[in-house]
A protein has these predicted regions:
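Accessory alpha/beta interaction modules
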Residues: 1-151, 220
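Alpha-helical solenoid repeat scaffolds
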Residues: 153-157
Length: 269
């Protein structure tokens, strides 16, 4: 398990900028504040946790999201949670943020003598269009976003909306472009991009790629990623979400060759 006592990657830095010190009390979770984002080692054949935070009380918070299109992988969730408990002896609390139809308050499953319980936080009452208007007014007036506003902005693409996802996401990205602080803008785009790439299928990644290519902050994210090396860039993280990569692209990534090879392939993909 990795925390920031090692050199944090570009994406980890963006997550920490948005979430560090954040409280989840605004959505009904009585937990300690976020200390930092945590990355765990990948377990073959199982989907990585969407979000894993180290809290100030030295417990871990594992967050997944669901709506009417996105369903959590409960098997992968339980495998990673139990692996962390057994390997590191840390307490893990797992929460699913539900933006779809109203769901039960928890998910329970037993594995022999092990009892696995996941809390579902029902956020189905959040209207994405209303939330968009509220955030648009705050951002437009230059107001600082509080903790609850930050959570709303990060998860805005997944809320109920009369528009399809491929129309909602560009609106969210355009809203973020209005944030005055450049580093803040970049952090939000990076965080939302990573969440989308981890939680949606190829269609979501395709929409995301189009949004990133067309925005100033998306280009900045790509350039910042290049400074760290190709394997740490957001662009590479997104590319790993494709079903497969040509052998010469895999070779270019592993050997950190000229990024133009990768960019040419991405443009044609």
């Amino acid at each position: 398990m990795r925390t920031n006592y090692q050199q944090e990657s570009f994406v980890e830095g963006c997550f920490n900028r948005i979430f560090k010190g954040l409280s989840f009390k605004g959505i009904g979770l009585e937990l300690a504040r976020v200390k930092e984002i945590v990355e765990v080692e990948r377990i073959e054949n199982y989907k990585l946790p969407l979000l894993l935070f180290l809290l100030e009380d030295d417990t871990l918070l594992h967050i997944e999201i669901m709506n009417d299109e996105i369903k959590p992988d409960f098997q992968s969730m339980s495998v990673y949670d139990m692996s962390i408990v057994l390997k590191y002896g840390m307490q893990v609390r797992t929460v699913i943020l539900n933006f779809g139809s109203k769901q039960n308050s928890n998910f329970q499953r037993s594995f022999g003598s092990v009892y696995y319980n996941t809390q579902i936080v029902d956020l189905s009452g959040l209207d994405g269009e209303r939330v968009y208007e509220e955030l648009s007014q705050k951002i437009g007036s230059g107001c600082l976003l509080d903790g609850r506003d930050k959570l709303k902005l990060v998860f805005l693409p997944f809320m109920k909306n009369s528009l399809p996802f491929n129309e909602v996401l560009p609106k969210v990205m355009s809203l973020i472009e209005k944030i005055k602080d450049e580093e803040e803008r970049m952090a939000y785009v990076a965080v939302i991009s990573e969440i989308i790439s981890r939680s949606t299928g190829d269609q979501g990644v395709k929409v995301l790629k189009e949004c990133l290519m067309d925005t100033e902050v998306g280009i900045r994210i790509r350039d910042e990623g290049k400074k760290e090396g190709m394997r740490d860039s957001l662009l590479i993280i997104l590319l790993h979400k494709f079903d497969s990569l040509p052998d010469y692209i895999n070779h270019a990534i592993m050997n950190q060759q000229n990024e133009s090879i990768l960019m040419d392939w991405l443009i044609k993909a």
